[in-house]
């Protein structure tokens, strides 16, 4: 069954791990097209602080889902999933495989697993259900469940208080039955066979040094002027907007407001980027069925190329 599904490749990694450079090399040698999986690169006019690929790179290796909205707008994980699925179908129809490249792990998870899923336990709702059960008993609660979710109720004994409570809790939190949510989740499973590649550094200190060098280069390369230009072009832009919460932009706004000096701007920008990398690596460690490649290895391209070639030929 899986072998008949079209192939897709995830190329994931923390910021400054070399994802873009590797992806560009791969698409020039293989039948792939890049879809950006980056919540910062979706914004127009935000080039320096997002380390957006330059025009020369984009001409050699076009990236989908770059520059899709302006900084005043919001782009959700749900919107990403919708756009990515459409693009993946188009790429597949052209006889190529989608190469999804980036570090926004929530987007990767949403694409792979869908938007469904059950809500976390809610102490207040559970307390309400316990009070109701104290009055009418769990068989009475089971009857309530049968009225809204007969399929789940049919699988449960009237005395199965824990599962009855959970099913009623889910309904009260979402307005949907457990049965409906499970069906929704099944329908959202990604209809592709996946190769998931994670770039991770064998030496975290080298990644930290890269991050520091890159942020300093952004400062010298016009980050301040870029943010000044954004404020001029989009007068309603403010620090609480999603676009301005991107790493580097928040700190630059603080500097422009006179709240921090040059050294603090630099230090806070580097620290925030390192924190982002730490969160990205934590997500990656929790992902299943992932091929981990050391992004500091000289032959990382060769390793990725061989893995993808083998994956694409397995049809």
From Swiss-Prot:
Keywords tagged on the record: ATP-binding, Magnesium, Nucleotide-binding, Transferase, tRNA processing
Q: Which residues bind substrate?
A: 15-20
What EC number(s) are associated with this protein in UniProt?
2.5.1.75
Q: Which cofactor does it need?
A: Mg(2+)
**Keyword Nucleus in record:** no
Q: Where is this site: Interaction with substrate tRNA?
A: 104, 126
A single Gene Ontology MF term assigned here is: ATP binding
Q: Where is this region: Interaction with substrate tRNA?
A: 38-41, 162-166, 245-250
The record's annotation in SUPFAM superfamilies points to: P-loop containing nucleoside triphosphate hydrolases
Question: What are the binding positions for ATP in this chain?
Answer: 13-20
Alphabetically, which GO biological process terms does the record hold?
A: tRNA modification
NCBIfam families (UniProt xref): miaA (TIGR00174)
This one is known as tRNA dimethylallyltransferase
Q: What is the lineage of its organism?
A: Bacteria, Pseudomonadati, Pseudomonadota, Betaproteobacteria, Nitrosomonadales
């Amino acid at each position: 069954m899986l072998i008949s599904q079209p192939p897709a490749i995830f190329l994931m990694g923390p910021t400054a791990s070399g994802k873009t450079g590797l992806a560009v090399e791969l698409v020039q040698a293989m039948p792939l097209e890049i879809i950006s999986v980056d919540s910062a690169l979706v914004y127009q006019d935000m080039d320096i602080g997002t380390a957006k690929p330059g025009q020369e790179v984009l001409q050699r290796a076009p990236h989908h889902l770059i520059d899709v909205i302006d900084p005043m707008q919001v782009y959700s994980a749900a919107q990403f999933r919708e756009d990515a699925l459409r693009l993946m179908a188009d790429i597949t129809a052209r006889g190529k495989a989608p190469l999804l490249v980036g570090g926004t792990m929530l987007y990767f998870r949403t694409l792979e697993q869908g938007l469904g899923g059950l809500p976390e336990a809610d102490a207040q709702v559970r307390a309400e259900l316990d009070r109701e059960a104290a009055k009418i008993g769990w068989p009475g609660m089971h009857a309530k469940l049968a009225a809204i979710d007969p399929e789940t109720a049919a699988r449960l004994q009237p005395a199965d208080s824990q599962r009855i409570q959970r099913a009623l809790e889910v309904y009260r939190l979402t307005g949907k039955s457990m049965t409906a949510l499970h069906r929704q989740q099944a329908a959202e499973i990604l209809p592709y066979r996946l190769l998931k590649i994670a770039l991770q550094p064998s030496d975290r200190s080298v990644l930290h040094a890269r991050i520091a060098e890159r942020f300093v280069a952004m400062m010298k390369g016009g980050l301040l002027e870029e943010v000044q230009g954004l404020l001029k072009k989009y007068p309603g832009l403010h620090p609480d907007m999603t676009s301005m919460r991107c790493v580097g932009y928040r700190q630059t706004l603080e500097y422009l407001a006179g709240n921090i000096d040059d050294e603090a701007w630099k230090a806070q920008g580097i620290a925030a980027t390192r924190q982002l990398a730490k969160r990205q690596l934590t997500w990656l460690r929790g992902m299943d069925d992932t091929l981990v490649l050391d992004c500091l290895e000289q032959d990382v391209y060769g390793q990725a190329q061989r893995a993808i070639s083998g994956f694409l030929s397995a049809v």
